[in-house]
């Protein structure tokens, strides 16, 4: 099983990750990220919006099994993160989340 927190930190430090609802939505519309991660407590409207555009773009969506506070902590950020998009996973194996989901 993939350690989500560790792989997320590796992806942030060695790859390219975009954080925040607006930035993730913009990334899905303008380019194709490899993976979108949503916090489990994301508002319904935000979750539906991101999932809709991700489905149109063929991007897998992973629901992080924790709150936006926990997702922020997993990313080693001092704030909440509702959504993030992995554009380049770098040396991480975060894309294996899709295989296990």
From Swiss-Prot:
Q: Which GO terms describe its molecular function?
A: RNA binding; structural constituent of ribosome
* Record flagged with keyword Ribonucleoprotein: yes
**GO terms under biological process:** translation
- Name the InterPro entries for this protein: Ribosomal_eL30, Ribosomal_eL30-like, Ribosomal_eL30-like_sf, Ribosomal_eL30_CS, Ribosomal_eL8/eL30/eS12/Gad45
Any one Gene Ontology cellular component term annotated for this protein: cytosolic large ribosomal subunit
User: Keywords of this protein's UniProt record, alphabetized?
Assistant: Ribonucleoprotein, Ribosomal protein
Q: Does the keyword Ribonucleoprotein apply?
A: yes
Q: Report which residue ranges the record marks as coiled coil.
A: none
| NCBIfam families cross-referenced by the UniProt entry | PRK01018.1 (NF002172)
The family line of this record is: Belongs to the eukaryotic ribosomal protein eL30 family.
Name of the protein in question: Large ribosomal subunit protein eL30
Native species: Pyrobaculum islandicum (strain DSM 4184 / JCM 9189 / GEO3)
């Amino acid at each position: 099983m993939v350690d989500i927190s560790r792989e997320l930190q590796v992806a942030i430090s060695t790859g390219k990750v975009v954080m925040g609802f607006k930035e993730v939505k913009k990334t899905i519309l303008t380019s194709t990220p490899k993976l979108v991660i949503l916090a489990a407590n994301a508002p319904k409207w935000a979750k539906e919006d991101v999932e809709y555009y991700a489905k149109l773009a063929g991007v897998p969506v992973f629901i992080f099994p924790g709150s936006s506070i926990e997702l922020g902590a997993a990313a080693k950020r001092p704030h909440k993160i509702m959504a993030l998009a992995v554009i380049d996973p770098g040396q991480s194996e975060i894309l294996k989340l899709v295989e296990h989901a």
